Amino acid sequence: MRRLDRPRLRDAIKLSTDEKWSHYEGDDPSTIGWINPENAPSIEQINAKFQELNAAEPMRLLREERNRRIAETDWWASSDLLISDDQRKYRQALRDITKTADPQLNEFDELINVTWPEKP
């Protein structure tokens, strides 16, 4: 399964403030060089946003993979052929997976704890 980059500190900074910054090192908010430090968000605010982004990452990846799998079968629903009951159930199970799955990431940043429906 394709894996995109995890959220990074720059993502948390961008979502925490409109304040301009010039640099940072790694994922350490204490290294951020602010252009106007008196208007900068606190390290706690940036860390909170960073944790929020990381907590949402498994569900974001689940939706991305689900959308890819649905797109693979779009031709079923848009072709002149009649879609079978198994095909219809498969597509519905993919749409419903975000309601039932509790996705997590393993040490390799791969989705685990997800049972995908079998493609007919």
Predicted regions located by residue number:
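A preference for well-ordered globular domain cores
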Residues: 1-120
